[in-house]
Each structure stands twice: as C-alpha cells, then as structure tokens.
Amino acid sequence: DETYDYSNLDMYSRMYPALSEIQEYLDKDGSKPFLLVEYCHSMGNGPGDFEDYFQMIQDNDKMCGGFVWEWCDHAIAHGTAENGKTIYAYGGDHGEEIHDGNFCMDGLVYPDRTVHTGLLEYKNVYRPARVISYDKESGELVLHNYMDFDDLKDYVKISYELTQDGLVISKGILPEFSVAPHGEGKTNLKINVPENGKCYLKLIYHLKKELPLLDEDHILGFDEIEVSKEDTKCKLAEKWIPKTVVDSELQVNENDTQIHIKGREFAYTIDKRTALFTEMKFAGREYLNHPMELNIWRAPTDNDMYIKSEWKKAHYDKAYTRAYTTEVVQGKHGVKITSHASVVAETVQKILDVTITWKIEAAGKIDADIAVTKDDEFPDLPRFGVRMFLDKKLSAVRYFGMGPQESYCDKHQAASHGLYRADVGDLHEDYIRPQENGSH
C-alpha cells in the first residue's frame, strides 16, 4: 500500500469527510488538529449539514474548523428573459467542448450576491450565543457564549418574543448579564405561557454597537424553544376549519372501481384501483383538479449527481400506485377504508408495499394512515409523500409552520415557527439550475 509522510505538517486535513471519518481519526489518532479543507458543499439546495459539523467542531478541541465551499455562484449575465429575470450562463453555454457544466455554481450567494437560503442557514448556525436550557416554571435561562474574546453583554443585546399559534403575544428585552467568552451565564425570564396552543419562545441576538460592516441592532441570529403546555392543538387552525354538522349521516356507495362518500357538506370519491382520492368537494368547492398520487420522485438537487442515475435505473421517475384489495367498514360516526397497495414501475419489481387507511368522519374530516415498506434492493427514496393537485385559483397560502424561507429536516436552523402568508409563486426558491426547492 502507498503511504504518505505527514511529519512536516502541523495539521491533518480532509476534503468533505463524513462525520464518521472525522470521529474515526479523533478516536484512533488525533495527534494533530483536524482542518476541513472544504466542507458543506453549497451547490444549489445543497448545504444541509452545517449544524452537524458545527457540533463536531465545538465538541472536540482538536477540530480547528474549516472552509465552506464556497462563497458565490460563478456565472455570466446574458441579458434578461421574457419574465424580466437575468439569464445566467455557465459551462457549456458558450459552445465550448471542455467545461464543468454548472459545477462553478456552488456558492452561498447567487452571482449578483443575492443570498441563498444556505447562507441564512450558515448564519444562524454560527450565531454568537445559544440557549443551553430554559425552565419555563422558574424562568431560569442559561446561555453559552460562543465568542472568542467578547463578553456577551458587550457584544449583543437580546430581545424575546413569545408566540401562540404563530402570533406574538408578548415581547421584550432581556436585561444585560455577563457571559464570558466560551462560558455559560444565567438570567431570569419569567413569561406567562398560555394553557393551550403551540407556544414558542424566541430569543433574538442583536449587535449592540455599530461595526465597520454592520449596523447597530443588526440581527446576528436567534434561538427558538417550544414552551407549549399539555394542550398543543393549534387553536387558530381549529377556527379556520368550517363548522359542520357532526351528527349527519354518511352515504357510502361503491362499485367495481370507485367508492363514493357523501355527507351534508362534502362529497369524496376514492379510486379502488389506486386507493387514493379523485374527488374532494367540500362546502360547495372542488379542491382537486387531478387524482391524488403517492409520490417518491422530485427534481434532483446538484448534490444528487451520483445517486440520480440509480434513481432513474430504478424508474422512480415513472412510478405509480396500484391497489390490490380494499375493505370498507362503516360505523356510527364515520367510515374506515383500508387498502393494500404498492408503488410500482414498469420492468422493475415492486418498489414499495403500502397499506393505506382513510378514516372519514360524518363532518367530513379525513384522517390518513399510510404505512410503507421499501424493498431493500432499491436505493434510498428521493422522497415520499402525497401529491394533491389543487385548482390554480387557490394561489394564496396561509400556514402555521416553519418559515419564512424553505426548510428541510437537515436545513431548518434559519427557519422558525410562525403564521405565514404568501403567494404560491413566492414559495419558490429560484435556483439557477432548477431543482427541488420550496419545502415549507
């Protein structure tokens, strides 16, 4: 085996090492500090592991940080499209034979230095302080100061907001208190948390004094803590749900291919061949303009460059749902419909084995339970979900959840819970190379 002599180097370094690879080095050797030459590749909707690497760096004294690749997308402006947006050209767009395609489009900002959501994620991961603990009964709040030289009271001022179901119900400014660099400090923040609803306490870190590049009060980051009590149902959402007569009887009729469920204010149809809804009419409005689908496909991100060929080989992009058996059980207060189905594609074996259970109440409420088992021979799924094709007139969105920008299971540090309004088009993140985006 070829070996290398590292004796003249003061540190050990790797490009894009997995966390397990870093831990293995720290456990087995660790004689030199570990430097991440490049990490968190920021291509398109890509940098989803900032928090994991931050924790690794902070938890190990032998980790000396690293360099995110990279700052900006590199592309050339080529005029504007019909919609008024700038056209950006990259590798291959000028007729050259040898090029790297869009591999130069891997930054935290767009070519015009507009911020990517990845930079927002990066910013909040590296906020100056973090909540260690909060006792909502006593009000004791413990913070850790991540600054190397500044006492927290000299660098930031901290405001807070208490929200219930996304609406701010109280706010204020914390009194100054000392937290030494890389130390912990305590203060008291006593708040009155409502007995019900989804409640969150948000601490916002503001720059205390103007710096050469930053204004006073510039937001440096935030922490969010759930402080809900036992009743966590979103009361605001309950108010949105139209009031219906709950004791009205259901009419359930079925034939060889369809199940029709009708109540006083709604009419639903389920296709027995797919076990999914083809019609959802409620309070006089039809919501679906295309049958519902189980979905495992999405537009590949740039960081899917290697696995996307496996996805295509598995025909994930051509998958559809097929139901085999359906059982209908009608009770006093509703109907339960259970189907055995699968997600399949032509020329390949069954991808997913699926059990779908719909419980429909007399008032029209639908509870769904979808249990899925994947064939281990297939690669990891791009995603799994239910697609509902709504009338295009339903373009205004109001939701309680994480926002305002897109967020994912591994990319949500910059998002917080709130009540958000937007047009459907505004939820789109316009990556220069079209790809998965806009998860809210």
List each model region and its residues.
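Intrinsically disordered, low-complexity Pro/Gly/Ser/Thr-rich segments with frequent PxxP/GP/PP motifs
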Residues: 156, 165-196, 205-206
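Terminal connector regions
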Residues: 193-236
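Short aromatic-acidic-glycine turn motif
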Residues: 161-173, 210-211, 391-401
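Exposed beta-strand and adjacent loop surfaces of beta-rich binding modules
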Residues: 138, 155-159, 200, 258, ...
